[in-house]
Each structure stands twice: as structure tokens, then as C-alpha cells.
Amino acid sequence: MGWSDLQPAMGGEAERFQAQLEVKLVTGGSPVVFTGNLTRQVGSKLAFSASLSHLLSDQANVTALLERKEENGRRVAALGAELFVPGLVGLRALGLLQQQGQLWTNSLRIQYSLLGQAKQAAHECSTSQKLRADSGSDGAYRLELRHELHCTQILAFSHKVQLWHEEDSGHLHSQLEVSYGKQWDKNSNKRHLRVSQTFKNDSGPALSNHFMEFVLQVPERQVDCRVQLYHLSLRLPYVESSSHLKVQYNGRPLFVAGGQWKDTSRATLWKWEGVLNLDSPWLMVSAAHRLYWPHRAVFQAVLELTLGKAWTLKDLVVSVGCRSQGPNREGKIQVYTAATTYLRVSTVTVLAQSLFHSWSELESAWNTAVQGEIHAENSRDRKILNCWLKGPQQELNLTAAYRHLEWPRKTQVSLTAVWIGAQGQPRGLQLEGELEELRQDRTLYRKRGALLLRHPLHLPIPQSLLLQETFTADRRHQRYSLETRVVLNGREETLQTMVLGCQAGHPYVCAGLMHPYDGKVIPRNTEGCLVTWNQHTSLALLSGLESGVQ
């Protein structure tokens, strides 16, 4: 059985609705009774209750109430609920939600018991949240958030979280705090975490100024870490900037780095200066850089470096300089400290239209000075390349040349290499070639070519070899000859001749050979001619052999 009632809105009161339901179930013993009630007031209240009797050892019931109201700009919503099941669970909950302007708060409290303790609340859990967000007319924004959770049965889950955030045109700050454990709500609790970050921007039209900080604190783990970054940059009257990074761990500097840069360049001048400093438990670095480039003809750069802790290096200087004036070029590279010169390189160069000359010197901490020179000429009738290299105990000179004359027509090519070892005894390789026109007219043409080779190496060829050939054309007497001369080691001379001609209408060929070797196989002096004197097949062979006697 049941009933319901609807009361319309009147007299400033909202519409109200009520209903009740009762159900009985008879099975031979005590009847099982279920009762339910519902009350609803539009816009403000909603209530519900239900009970069950004669089914369990005791009466089971559940109730719920939801209320809403608003007064003086404050809106409130409340929720209450109870649940009881004999021998199983007993629960009571109370919730509250409030909003006033930019502030929102809510809370929830639950008391419960299980099994045999269902009638009496044995445990309790509660949670609450708070949120506030404000926006000012100046563009500032603020946010605050708080959260709490506490359980008597599981204390390790109890915690408190707080978040603050502030932001305006040139400033931003955020902080997060978390407290947990059995003493979560006490200021002396060591089981908490704090994280914060800050950013500032104080820049202007010709200024950039930034600051950033990050903090992490965990007292239980003995962790206190702080990171700070600062940057400043100026753009007028010249460019200058500096940046610094600092990392602290438990109050001690863990890592510190800083850099500065200045650019005072103008239209035709480049001038830079920079400094870098770094300090950590493992390594210390201090570096400075300077660049000076006033115009195209002068350049100078210097780097100074100091290392400490893991590697030790004190006042290392790296200097690079270049200078030019007319056809002259000069460059220097130096790497040194006050006690040691690690590297020194210098070079002087002359560059003209057909001339290149360069002189260089290299010295390091691992070897004494090494000098070198390169000379090159390039013209229509002469080309020369000379390379010279001198070390502490050895010296090398390499020369390649090409010469050409139009009158008398003569061409020379040569390659010379001279090596001086530790003993001071020079050893050289010479290779020369020459082609020369000795005579050229209407009746006589003569041309000579020569090749000379000298070397000190142990090879299956003579250490001195001269090969010379002379070609003669006598147009008046219709006589052509080729003479080949070979001289080995400056003493052993071999001469071979070949003559082709025509006399009185009779063509002839003559050949001769003269050598200084054993004449048992080939006579030392041999000559032979082949002559034709008719138009048929008749031939005459004239030969003469010389072996000391003609």
C-alpha cells in the first residue's frame, strides 16, 4: 500500500511532493515489511529513506538527503546518507559543496564499520578540496588549490596537497606541497615534498632580463635541490649578454656555469669578447675568447683555457693571427703556456702574378723546429717549383724546372732531389731532359736530345746514365743520320750511328757500333754499309771490322 501528495507552489514556497510505499510479505511467520519514503521540494530538497524488517537479524535501512540553498551570494549543497545492513556494513556519509565568488570548497566525511561492528562506526575517512581562482584588472592571475585525505584505518594513505600559482605580465610563480603519512597534518612532518618554480621577465626595448628558479625538497630523503638560471642581454649601444646557471644540492654548489659575450663591432670592424666559467665537483673550466678583425688584411683570435680537478691545465693560450700587405701574407698559430710551448706555426707568403713564395716553420713540444720553403715561378718560357724541408737532423730539397727558348729553340726539363741525413752526407737524385735545335737552314737541319739520370739508390740500373741522340738531315748531300750515345757511370761510353743517304743515284744505309766491353762476341768497333747500284737485284755489301786493327 502507499500514498502520494503534491502541494503546488504558493505563498513563496516551492512545489512539494511526498510519497510513501509499504509492502508486506507474509510467509507463515512474522511478515517481511519494506517501507519507503520520498520527499521532493523543487530546487531545494530531496529526501529518500527505505527500511526492511523481519528479514535479517535486525532492521536494515538506508536514508539519503540532498539540500541546496543560496543566500548572500553563497551557494551551498549538502548531502547526507546512512546505510545499515545487519552483520555486514554500517555507513554514514556527509558531504558539503560551497561556492562563493571565485572560491569553491567541498568536503566529504564517511564513517563506516564492517561485519560484526556494523552498529558502531569503527573507522572514518574524510576528504576536502578548496579551489580559488582570481583574475585582476591588471592582468594578474592567481590560483590556489588544496586537497586533504585522511583515513583512520590506513594512515599511510593520509595526505595533504597544496598548490599555489601566480602570474602577471612579468612574473610567474608556482608551488606544490605534498604532506603524507601518519603526521600528515603537522608542520613538523618530515614526510613531505615541496616543488616550486619562479620565472621573471624584466625586459625592455633594448634590454632582455630573465630569471628562472626551480626548487625540489624532500626532507625524508635528505634532498634539497635548487636550480637558478639568469640571463641578461643589452642591445644598445653594443651587444652584450651574460648567462649564469647555478645548481645547489643540500646547500652546496653542485654545478656553476657562467658565460659573457660582448660584440662591439662596427661597420668595418669585427670585435668580439667572450668568457666561459664552469665549476663542478669533477671539473673546473675557465675559458676566454677574443677576436679582433679591423679590416680584411688583419685578423687575430686568442683563446685562453684553464682546467682543474679531473684534468689540470693552467693558462693555455691558443693564438691565431693573419696579416697581409700588398702581395705579402703572414700567418701565425701558437699554442703555449707559461712553462711549455705545445705548438708554434708561422708562415710568410708572397703571391704575385707569376710568383709564389712561402716560408713556414713548425715547432711543438714533441719535436724541435721544422722549417719549410716553397718557391714557384710561372712564366711563358720558365716554370720552376722548389720545395725545401729541414728538420732537426734531416734536410730535403726538391726542385722541378722547365725552360724553353724560342731562338735558338731549346727546351729543358729537370727534377732534382737532395737528401741530407743525420750523418751530414748529401744524397741526391737528378733527372734532366733536354731537346735542342743545333742548326736549321735550307740545306742542313740538326737536332739533339739528351736524358741524364743520377741516383744513389741500390737498383738494378746504373747510378749514372746519360742517353744522347743527335739527328742530322743534310739536304744538299741527301744524307740523314742518327747518332745515339750512352754513357754509364761516367766511364762506359757506347756510340751507335745510323746513316741513310743516296749518292750518285745509289741509295745506301750505314750503321756503326762502338763500345768499351769485351769484343769476343761483338767487336768493339763495327761498321757496315748496304748499297744498291742498279735497278735490278744486284746489291753490294761493304763492311769493315775493327778489333784493334783496321
Swiss-Prot record:
Q: Name one Pfam family in it.
A: LOC400499
Question: InterPro entries attached here?
Answer: LOC400499-like
Top-rank taxon, per record:
Eukaryota
Query: What PANTHER family does the record tag this protein with?
Result: AGAP008810-PA, VITELLOGENIN DOMAIN-CONTAINING PROTEIN
| The name this protein goes by in its record | Putative uncharacterized protein LOC400499
Organism of this sequence: Homo sapiens (Human)
Source organism lineage? Eukaryota, Metazoa, Chordata, Craniata, Vertebrata
